[in-house]
Amino acid sequence: MQEREEKTMIIDTHVHIGGEAVGFHMTEQMVLESMEKYHIDYALVSNGDAGEMTHKQELLPDEVQITQEKALQRMLVFARQHPGKIGIQVWVKPYLQGLTKELETMIQDNLDIIYAVKLHPFHSNTSPTDEKVLPYLALAEKYHLAVVSHTGGCEAANPVHLYEAAKLFPKVPFVMVHMGLGTDNKEALDLLGKADNLYGDTTWVPMSTTIEAIKRYGSKKMLFGSDSPIDGVDTYFCNPKGERSLYQDYFHVLPEKISGDAYEDLMYRNAIRIFGISL
């Protein structure tokens, strides 16, 4: 198995635990094992336990719904146990809960390890500009947090809605996770240049799209992210069928296709700047 040579620092801005009710199997131990095996220096992690809907966008049964506060509490334990390795993105539940005082207090009390609000417009079927979501965006602005959002798969998750949210909150960094999952990324690429506070990540994004983004806009607009460990501990290497992961391109091919500075921006420097990470 080809593992990445340990050279450039890597911050993975899109890592998960939880999500069993939705059908995922992603544990804290899997995250740590994968980070160790593939030399990931730091991970921003969100808890899929806060997912609200199935892959068919049907509400999960009440008995398996987990509050956003309980999901965050699990993340707080994980991050506190691994200082300097794990940061938090707070996965929220706009469809069923909305912003609560309890959630805000938990965030306010843990700003040293919380870096972003995590939206999932597909698993909440709620647009980033929906009135249920706007209080979360205002919260991000209040506490100088970024907003990261899944894009792609349904109307609510169309990248244009995150662009519209970015225009509403110009002081908040917004990250288009996936750059429109399941698309040719063209819409997201065009939107990337229309708002200074709008960024993209590499999660399931072909290397060619990232190269095009750097060509158009310079090296400050894209972040490395992976969805690990969604395909298991070896997400960075292959899927469960043994098929090569596109992240191997990011580790072994991309460094020969862009400048060293651009590669370092993508793999860690942009994350430090955009999220305000202190290592």
Question: Where is each model-derived feature located?
Answer:
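Active-site gating/metal-coordination segments in enzymes
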Residues: R4-E5, E58-V148, K194-L198
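Active-site environment of divalent metal-dependent phosphoester hydrolases
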Residues: G18-E20, A50-M53, P94-G98, S124, ...
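Conserved, mostly hydrophobic/aromatic
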Residues: H14, M35, M75, V117, ...
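Distinct, well-ordered alpha-helical segments
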Residues: G98-Q108, S127-Y136, E155-F169, D184-L192, ...
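H/E-rich (His + Asp/Glu) clusters that bind or coordinate divalent metals
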Residues: P173, G180-L279
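An N-terminally biased module of ancient metal coordination in phosphate/nucleic-acid-related enzymes
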Residues: M1-K70
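Hydrophobic faces of well-ordered beta-strands that scaffold small-molecule active sites
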Residues: I11-V15, A43-V45, I86-V90, Y115-L119, ...
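Active-site gating loops and adjacent loop-to-helix segments of metal-dependent hydrolytic enzymes
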Residues: Y38-Q65, N110-I114, V172, P229-G232, ...
